[in-house]
Amino acid sequence: MAFSRGPVFLLLLLYLLWGSDTSLIRLNENGYEDIIIAIDPAVPEDTTIIEHIKGMVTKASTYLFEATEKRFFFKNVSILIPESWKDSPQYRRPKQESYKHADIKVAPPTVEGRDEPYTRQFTQCEEKAEYIHFTPDFVLGRKQDEYGDSGKVLVHEWAHLRWGVFDEYNEDQPFYSASSKKIEATRCSTGITGTNRVYACQGGSCAMRRCRTNSTTKLYEKDCQFFPDKVQSEKASIMFMQSIDSVTEFCKKENHNREAPTLHNKKCNYRSTWEVISTSEDFNSSTPMETSPSPPFFSLLRISERIMCLVLDVSGSMTSYDRLNRMNQAAKYFLSQIIENRSWVGMVHFSSQATIVHELIQINSDIERNQLLQTLPTSANGGTSICSGIKAAFQVFKNGEYQTDGTEILLLSDGEDSTAKDCIDEVKDSGSIVHFIALGPLADLAVTNMSILTGGNHKLATDEAQNNGLIDAFGALASENADITQKSLQLESKGAILNNSLWLNDTVVIDSTLGRDTFFLVTWSKQAPAIYLRDPKGTQTTNFTMDSASKMAYLSIPGTAQVGVWTYNLEAKENSEILTITVTSRAANSSVPPITVNAKVNTDTNTFPSPMIVYAEVLQGYTPIIGARVTATIESNSGKTEELVLLDNGAGADAFKDDGVYSRFFTAYSVNGRYSLKVRADGGRNSARRSLRHPSSRAAYIPGWVVDGEIQGNPPRPETTEATQPVLENFSRTASGGAFVVSNVPSGPLPDLYPPNQITDLQATLDGEEISLTWTAPGDDYDVGRVQQYIIRTSKNIIELRDNFNNSPRVDTTNLTPKEANSEETFAFKPENITEENATYIFIAIESVDKSSLSSGPSNIAQVALFTPQAEPDPDESPSSSGVSVATIVLSVLGALVLVCIIVGTTICILKNKRSSSAAITKF
């Protein structure tokens, strides 16, 4: 039965439209509330970190208030403290705060020795980022010389996080040819003054020299750096170098530097940072304050053991599609392998009414796990009352003498319940976190709102058992606050429908970062299959434990499993047999973080025809893994699956190339309702490696300052090159990305409503008299297929091209045949009507058009300078420009003085000689 769509539902729907942003931040009367700063479990205990966090945020709040013209400040902040740190009377238990929802993470650096503060940002302009990453040394103030005051750095990163702006410097293009025909440092605003120099240190000594010009680029050489003057008067911009004392503002339209090749210009279409911030929802829902705000309020929350209640549906519909048995298989997997030791777990069954079948018990060994396994349901009947089950879970917590704050409810249901919306407010106010697993196509949508409102997970498992969705969903519910080295990670999840004597064969890789508690799980629907498992040395393992009643077999590898390729072969013994296999393992060494994959979509709810964006992040610790092979499987609630190859190429849906985030558009909607996401990642063909590049969206490193005309350099930061990146051993991972809901999908064939994706990586270079262009090909439908044609236009004015693309001069592209999506495109043309006298810039943009005449819109704008810019004059050489240098003037003055002295001296001598001659004659 469908529930009525009253005011409560509409309010919740509006909340959902915020997207899949995991942050719990709210803006309330100009103040940001519910900010979470989490200290990583890998950080050794040091309570001074907490005090430094408080000081940093307090200073940042004042700075933010002034920088935003008295609009925003930090109102209250929760600091999450690791469970491994000693308890204190001032620490409280978290409610819905968790590491998953952290806005700022204090964690080890991405690469040892590099403490650069950055924001994990893999979305587009104006879109919120993931989190800010500070290292302990940075928070403790040990990197102030390199990055400046930590409070000002926090405001720089907050702008990335909250408003989706980007940096206004560019270390890949630190200099550019300005319209003044001079070489300028990439910055905003141009009012920031400084000196360009090469600063090199070796063997404890450092030397400095002038920058030379590169003969190819006509710009300064690679090692040239811009050293800002310590004393400045310019106030902008925070997104360039917030460490400058005078800088207190974001660049505005009036002082924005559109010429500079900054990432912000490229991503935000040459708008200033303040223009972007001014269009944000935060800005539009606030007005400047008349008084100064109070300092931030801090809550200290220490992670503690999990308190969870399983709330399992035993209504009559659970007898369909083998749902009851499949739920029990997945629950056994969760209770035996996923839930952590020291957790408190209880269990409730519900249909028309709810029954407490097990009070809270702390898991310390297999004894407690087995006690819980004995209480799994064996029969199902009756209706569905979800609120009854949730209220029974609250009673379980109360019976265990726990408040509901921070407790977790794992709710599984397959049915609709018109009364489910009645307890939404109670659930939200409880402080409990609801994780919802929707089983089948009819599970109630109101409960989806519960999970999102409480910060829980939302999963979908269809009735297509071969897709293994139910086991994947339970397996994804490990603690969000546990150390990653203690979590059970999924290496394999696969299934198939097979006839008698047919096989499910494949391999799974156990890499050196894993191997502890390795677990193989096989399930079937009719009769136990023949199971063959061989380790990397070829030794066969046959000692699986058979659980015929639950139709599952499992094997735990003692100690640390062998590194390498494990081979499995499963032989079906019945026709139309459904077999699945799941493999999990934990980190082999607590000091070496394992490779992980995390998956998500850009929004929890969507309306046709808006596309979804699928993301998969592959990391080792905080270090991105690039060059991996990543695929996503999207399953509708009817069981239909679509597979996408995710890309890290910086084109289409992917915002940044080689950042360890693999992305793709998804538009292949088939039905209304829920869809689930599952991602698989492996090492590819010996191509995966750790990225040692500096992360994007970070505070600028200060190479030094110009003080009283002298450069005072900082120690050069640690650098690495592409050549030093090691190729990784092969690995395999799978991960559940949760569920999303799509509405308004029409029945029947879908019309062509999807244009090509916008080109975002257009680059232009001047090659003799020709301009060469490169870009990544879009597709007929976003990043799939092939476009019909490209339209290339140019202009001498960047804003004219941006705002009036269709009326700008068009380049002849008769001989340009589009390639398949995600291919590299190249094209060269000779610009017309350009003379040496008026040569400045040419700006170029591309629009792609598909067979239905749908266009992508103009690309990012590339530019080419048609002149050789002037470098800073060298005092050792004659200047090439007109005018007289200071040295020339000085030499001229000295020469004139010498000449005057010679003339005066000669005159005196002549006069003396005349006097001598006259005296002799008179005397005579």
Swiss-Prot record:
The residues that the entry says bind Zn(2+) are 156, 160, 167
For the region Metalloprotease domain, give the residue spans: 46-200
Look up the signal peptide feature and give its range: 1-22
Q: How is it modified after translation?
A: N-Glycosylated. The translation product is autoproteolytically cleaved by the metalloprotease domain in the endoplasmic reticulum into a N-terminal and a C-terminal products that remain physically associated with each other. The cleavage is necessary for calcium-activated chloride channel (CaCC) activation activity.
Q: Name one GO biological process term.
A: proteolysis
Tissue expression, per UniProt? Expressed in the non-goblet intestinal cells. High levels in intestine and stomach, and lower levels in eye, liver and spleen. Increasing expression from the duodenum to the ilium, and decreasing expression to the colon. Isoform 2 is expressed in intestine and stomach but at lower levels than isoform 1.
**Which residues carry out catalysis?**
157
GO MF terms here are: chloride channel activity; intracellularly calcium-gated chloride channel activity; ligand-gated monoatomic ion channel activity; metal ion binding; metallopeptidase activity
Question: What protein name is recorded for this chain?
Answer: Calcium-activated chloride channel regulator 4A
Organism in which the protein naturally occurs: Mus musculus (Mouse)
Gene name for this UniProt entry? Clca4a
